[in-house]
């Protein structure tokens, strides 16, 4: 994507959040200004999600922005950041799907504390794209809806996310249609980048894969 530098060029992505948002949203302002429901917005585009591991345990969504493809960046307590691979995300989502089936996911239980990395991904905007195959077992659950907002690092981060996805949708989506690459996530069944194949196991320490699609534009 021409407006988004490759992730390897960033020293600290979080500090460049505003720049990323401007680049991703520099679109035609002559489109319809009518806001669309977030459920429709999520189906039309991907998301760049920056998740921060908390020193006391658990994870929080630091920032997230609309993107043509869905990517997850993990920031550890020391400030080091890396992109999760397709295999890592597929493995996390497979584990979370099993927990949801068993009724043990903190996303579907009231008062859940210290969400796992997989649960945090599913609570982000990326969750509706990457975890669409989980369906109503998660996204129509009232406990999930209550947990989602608390997963963000701050109320301001939540509001920025909501506003950026609404703004991007109204600026880029043609009336009544969805466009090329941005429509792919709605049909995703399990793969990180919209692959319909079954999630595969992956080494937890891997940060890149020769068979994975390119992350950058």
From Swiss-Prot:
Primary localisation category: membrane
Membrane association type: Lipid-anchor
Composition bias type Low complexity, residue spans: 167-217
Alphabetized UniProt keyword annotations: Cell membrane, Lipoprotein, Membrane, Palmitate, Signal
Compartmental location: Cell membrane
Region annotation Disordered: where it falls in the sequence: 150-217
Lipid-acceptor residues (N-palmitoyl cysteine): 27
Residue positions bearing lipid (S-diacylglycerol cysteine): 27
Keyword Lipoprotein: yes
Gene Ontology CC annotations of this record: plasma membrane
Stretches with biased composition (Polar residues): 150-166
Secretion signal, residue range per the UniProt entry: 1-26
Superkingdom field: Bacteria
Family that this chain belongs to: Belongs to the UPF0323 family.
HAMAP family reported in the protein's UniProt record: UPF0323
Classification via NCBIfam families: PRK04081.1
Protein name: UPF0323 lipoprotein WS0575
Species whose genome carries this gene: Wolinella succinogenes (strain ATCC 29543 / DSM 1740 / CCUG 13145 / JCM 31913 / LMG 7466 / NCTC 11488 / FDC 602W)
